[in-house]
Amino acid sequence: MNVLVYGAGAIGCHIGYCMYATGNVVYLIGRGEHYNQMKRDGMHIRICDNEILKREQVVKEDSMFYIMSDINNIKDVKFDYVFITVKLDDYNEHALQNLYPYMGKNTAVIPPCTKLPFWWFYNLEGESNERFKDVDFDQQLSKYFVRENIICMTMWLSSVIENPGNVCVKHVQRGYPLKEVYPKMKNSADKLRDIFKLTCKSPDVDNIRSEIFIKSINSFAFNTVALDREFNNLQLSQDEYSKDCIRKIMLEGDQILSVLNIPIIQNIEDRISQTLSSTKHTMSMLNDYRKGKQIELDCLWEGFSSVCKILRIDMEFSKYMYEKVMDKVCTRQSSADLNE
């Protein structure tokens, strides 16, 4: 099969590796020095269980693995799967305009999972939810998708680019839980799950909205508190105040599932324990903050804020923590600009 991975970050590289290792043709789209290094010397990937190295490989370009910087250089290829693995700030209309020609009428598309998606209310079951079935709160993105072709996949790995060309998967938690959003893609979703299981984890899931919600609220809660406290996972696990803040954010967010009668498939304590089991991990936004890079917290909060307005729900403590952290980030950026 032909697989396009649009975004050669740490997760995108691991997905590319999983697809290539199971005999599929992979087109990996990257940029910058990371792309240059991979193009020259191949993609070096290490897969660990915290401190234990499980697997290590260098994947170089060949007739089954293409490392590219410009998607427009791909000619006459029909893709079975398209993974969109760019950062949320880059998941925009410009990116989708580039991708659109490669998302055919039968191409399964796996968009980012961290932010509550534009299709959140589509095909939502339950009589009480009928009034929400046509709600679209992100029309700039949704117009590029065939909704029936979407496969939702969440990503539960601690993964990082250690330096250009070198990716380390520090810990695999649940791997890649996935499910079709519409019945049309069931066979494609089942096939994709079987492929992932050959090299990673990909559990069966009953309710994909519950999965993606938990991933999104996890990301928002842990990244917000990590940025506020400037703690890695080990430090968060040892600090009761931090864990209490995480609990409060998750509890507020769970109102969304309750109102829509979506099952809460994992309780809050299990979510906290699962995430903090990656003791060597530092939350991605804290890593970016320390490096002076732009963080994505505003994208996450935008998704929750949009849904809360539609459902008339308050996330007062979450909003307070979000604004507190963004003030901190903006103050640091202003200081950096003055010192340039």
Task: Walk through the language-model features, giving the residues of each.
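Rossmann-like NAD(P)(H) cofactor-binding subdomain of soluble oxidoreductases
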Residues: 56-163
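NAD(P)-dependent Rossmann-like dehydrogenase/reductase catalytic/cofactor-binding core
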Residues: 244-340
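NAD(P)+-binding Rossmann beta1-loop-alpha1 motif at the extreme N-terminus of oxidoreductases
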Residues: 1-53
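Helix-loop-beta segment of a Rossmann-like dinucleotide-binding subdomain
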Residues: 103, 117-127, 168-177, 230-236, ...
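Conserved beta-strand termini and adjacent loop/short-helix elements that scaffold enzyme active sites
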Residues: 29, 48, 68-71, 153-155, ...
